């Protein structure tokens, strides 16, 4: 069975880009436009990994991170933002990784593989 990745991104073009790229790598991909939708997706069926934008309407990524971790600490979460300043925010330390947004998804894909491999070992 393919690992299920939840991509949480408010920018539609970027969300679709991530979805297509990750599907081409063999992952099952579900998406959410904001933190509130992400929490609903987690409640409906735990993804194997979450890629979480930070700056979003309705509920931002930091609030969503906090709420998701209260529900399930086992899901690896990658914070994904254009803003490098959030890397220093102590709340971001609760995530498993922080990857700066880029049109080259090599770093993100490598981090996904690494975290999913770690999850299987546990």
Which residue ranges define each predicted feature?
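Hydrophobic/aromatic residues positioned on beta-strands within the core alpha/beta folds
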Residues: 78-80
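Charged docking surfaces used in two-component/phosphorelay signaling
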Residues: 16-24
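Short hydrophobic/Thr-rich beta-strand motif most characteristic of the beta2 strand and flanking loop
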Residues: 26-33, 41
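Alpha4 helix (beta4-alpha4-beta5 surface) of REC/receiver domains from two-component response regulators
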Residues: 63, 83-110
């Amino acid at each position: 069975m393919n690992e299920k990745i939840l991509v949480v991104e408010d920018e539609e073009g970027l969300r679709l880009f991530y979805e297509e790229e990750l599907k081409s790598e063999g992952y099952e991909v579900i998406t959410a436009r904001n933190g509130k939708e992400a929490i609903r997706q987690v409640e409906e069926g735990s993804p194997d990994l979450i890629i979480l934008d930070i700056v979003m309407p309705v509920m931002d990524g930091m609030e969503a991170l906090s709420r998701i971790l209260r529900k399930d600490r086992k899901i690896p979460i990658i914070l994904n933002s254009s803003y490098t300043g959030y890397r220093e925010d102590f709340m971001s330390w609760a995530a498993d990784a922080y990857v700066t947004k880029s049109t080259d998804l090599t770093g993100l894909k490598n981090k996904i593989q690494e975290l999913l491999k770690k999850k299987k070992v546990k």
